[in-house]
A protein has these predicted regions:
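Conserved N-terminal beta1-alpha1 strand-loop-helix module at the mouth
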Residues: 1-202
Length: 202
């Protein structure tokens, strides 16, 4: 997200985390610091194989609460990053591209290195491609690290999300299918989706 008003509107919906893309190749890349950054929602910085010093500097400049890594960052990289950012970053998320149960094996070396995994759709482009993978693949996930479900979840998927259960599911990622244009969220679509999910839980 990049626009101050849109950030305020989305935060007002009670969203837990708000993401800011710091990968220059992304159409959602944050070119400059927004005039407003979330005060109640956690600030998530998304990086792809970035120089570790760049991540550290960005995390400090934006007062990030969470770092989300979408590249081929190693467990050693994550350990080093955590030591550099321990004063302000509380959580590190590592994303993995998933298509088959075999893909889940790549998470094993990261157990204990990261706080959450994020399971995204395997595609040529990194993130935000609007397509889903077969969530039943995650029935084979037996890891101890909680995960965030990502990959093409849209406004029409509320019932599907409510029907999905896994003991390690920690949350869902709402991205490109809730946008009017890259980096700008449709607040009405988000509100309706969130209300549908919450009503089911009451």
């Amino acid at each position: 997200m990049r626009e101050a008003d849109n950030i305020r509107q989305v935060e007002a919906l009670g969203i837990d985390w708000l993401g800011f893309i710091f990968w220059p190749k992304s159409s959602r890349f944050v070119h400059e610091r927004p005039a407003y950054l979330p005060a109640s929602a956690k600030r998530v910085g998304v990086f792809v194989d970035a120089d570790i010093e760049v991540v550290r500097e960005t995390a400090a400049a934006y007062c990030l609460d969470i770092i989300q890594l979408h590249g081929k960052e190693s467990p050693a990289y994550i350990k080093h990053l955590r030591s550099l950012c321990s004063d302000y970053v509380a959580v590190i998320v590592k994303a993995f591209n998933i298509a088959t149960p075999e893909d889940l094996k790549q998470t094993e070396p990261y157990e204990g290195a990261t706080d959450y995994f994020l399971f995204d759709t395997k595609a040529k482009m990194v993130g935000g491609n609007g397509t889903q993978f077969d969530w039943t693949v995650l029935n084979d996930y037996q890891g101890n690290t909680p995960f965030i479900l990502s990959g093409g979840i849209g406004p029409d998927d509320a019932e599907k999300v409510k029907a999905f259960h896994h003991p390690m599911l920690a949350g869902i990622d709402l991205n490109s299918r809730f946008e009017t244009v890259p980096a700008h969220k449709d607040v009405n679509l988000l509100r309706t989706f969130i209300e549908t999910i919450k009503n089911e839980k009451q």
